[in-house]
């Protein structure tokens, strides 16, 4: 009897990860993105993700069922649904013919349960200093540690209010070695991602905090503005 109760508890506390990353249900996601730096001017732009549905494609000379997502910059990202999670497995730039294989990067785990943890390879991309003739961007690799923090979030976006969302929090730290003027910079990274059942990613916040006044802290806020189903 206890065994049956335990099974019921596990099933009731877990969720189907594909519901929160419905690449076969939603065709287009449109987002607003605001970059809020401490030392530079704010920037606001739009981002669009276009799902091409499930495709049989060759990856490392092996046929796989993948989900391509075309981004607004012409880059296509490829996702694969496996038994233990949803992974990003490759990408292709605008003029390339072949898919570039990546180390598997977990987007959401299976099963999706409270306090579930995992880590992924990531890199900094918000830290920027503008000069008269060039932009200096502090980009470096690090490990981002993720955790399912909540499965009952209510989130307001320009596209509407979404209930029973999951919240994924992430954190990491790294060092960037710059030129003689900049030296070594300590960086802390904080991330929050909200996913709605049947819609997918609806909001994301990311903070990259440096230990120098030269770059300061930069925050990014991404909000779902609209979506279109297949």
Residue spans for each PLM region:
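Conserved functional acidic sites
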Residues: 14-230
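Sec-dependent N-terminal signal peptides
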Residues: 2-12
């Amino acid at each position: 009897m206890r065994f049956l109760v335990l099974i019921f508890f596990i099933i009731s506390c877990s969720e189907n990860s594909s519901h929160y990353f419905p690449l076969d249900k939603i065709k287009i996601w449109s987002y607003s993105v605001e970059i809020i730096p401490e030392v530079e001017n704010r920037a606001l732009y739009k981002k669009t993700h276009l799902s091409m549905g499930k495709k049989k494609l060759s990856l490392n000379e092996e046929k796989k069922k993948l989900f391509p997502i075309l981004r607004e910059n012409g880059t296509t990202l490829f996702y694969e649904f496996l038994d233990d999670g949803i992974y990003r497995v490759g990408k292709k730039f605008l003029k390339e013919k072949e898919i570039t294989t990546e180390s598997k990067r977990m987007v959401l785990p299976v099963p999706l349960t409270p306090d579930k943890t995992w880590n992924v390879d990531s890199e900094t991309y918000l830290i920027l200093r503008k000069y008269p003739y060039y932009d200096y961007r502090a980009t470096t690799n690090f490990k981002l540690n993720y955790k399912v923090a909540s499965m009952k979030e209510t989130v307001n976006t320009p596209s509407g209010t979404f209930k029973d969302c999951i919240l994924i929090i992430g954190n990491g730290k790294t060092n960037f070695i710059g030129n003689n003027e900049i030296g070594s910079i300590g960086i802390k990274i904080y991330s929050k991602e909200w996913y709605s059942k049947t819609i997918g990613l609806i909001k994301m916040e990311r903070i990259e905090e440096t230990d120098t006044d030269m770059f300061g802290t930069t925050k990014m806020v991404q909000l779902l503005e609209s979506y279109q189903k297949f």
